[in-house]
From Swiss-Prot:
Family per similarity comment: Belongs to the MntP (TC 9.B.29) family.
Native organism: Desulforudis audaxviator (strain MP104C)
Alphabetical list of PANTHER family matching this protein: MANGANESE EFFLUX PUMP MNTP-RELATED
Protein's job: Probably functions as a manganese efflux pump.
Protein name, as recorded: Putative manganese efflux pump MntP
């Protein structure tokens, strides 16, 4: 997998976190809680691809090239899912979630990081460089999340939806690239 592909993939994975953080930031999420959430997003965007990578590497040895097809199908599915969700009406984030504390933030971070587990599986089947790729995914997701909080007071609500739509289209493209 090329560096450009890894960056595109990392950006696509970071769009869910960006959208969440933008929505929370627009609703007055406190700075301390915002930085805790960003840290959790970074951690999960590094750990989950590593876990998925090991599962994908094992599967790649077990079933060979078919594992790459499965990985491409997973990326394609995730991309379509993200596009559909970005077009759905009535999705909102709320700053009231702060009351849930650290556990609530962990659940929020996990909700936007689970796609990274599936992507890690795909990386394992493709034989991608594990630590570098997971680090890039975590760094990009963290930067996108932090940027969303910083920019939240300057942007309109429509940006979050379009970011998720773009991320879904990128995942579809990466999935198709793995097939061909």
């Amino acid at each position: 997998m090329t560096a450009g592909t890894v960056l595109l993939l990392a950006g696509a994975l970071g769009t869910d976190a960006f959208s969440l953080c933008l929505g929370l930031g627009l609703n007055g999420f406190r700075r301390r809680m915002a930085w805790m959430l960003v840290g959790l997003i970074v951690a999960l965007h590094v750990v989950l691809p590593v876990a998925g990578w090991y599962a994908g590497e094992f599967t790649g040895r077990l079933v060979g090239r078919w594992a790459a097809y499965l990985g491409a199908a997973i990326l394609f599915y995730l991309g379509v899912k993200m596009v559909r969700e970005s077009l759905a009406e009535g999705r909102t984030a709320t700053g009231k979630l702060e009351r849930a504390g650290f556990l609530g933030l962990t659940v929020l971070a996990g909700s936007v990081s689970m796609d990274a587990l599936s992507v890690g599986f795909t990386l394992g089947t493709a034989g991608a460089a594990l630590l570098l790729t997971a680090g890039v995914i975590g760094l990009v997701a963290g930067l996108m999340s932090a940027a969303a909080f910083v920019l939240a007071h300057r942007v309109e609500d429509w940006v979050g939806r379009r970011a998720e739509l773009l991320g879904g289209l990128v995942l579809i493209g990466v999935g198709l690239r793995l097939l061909f």
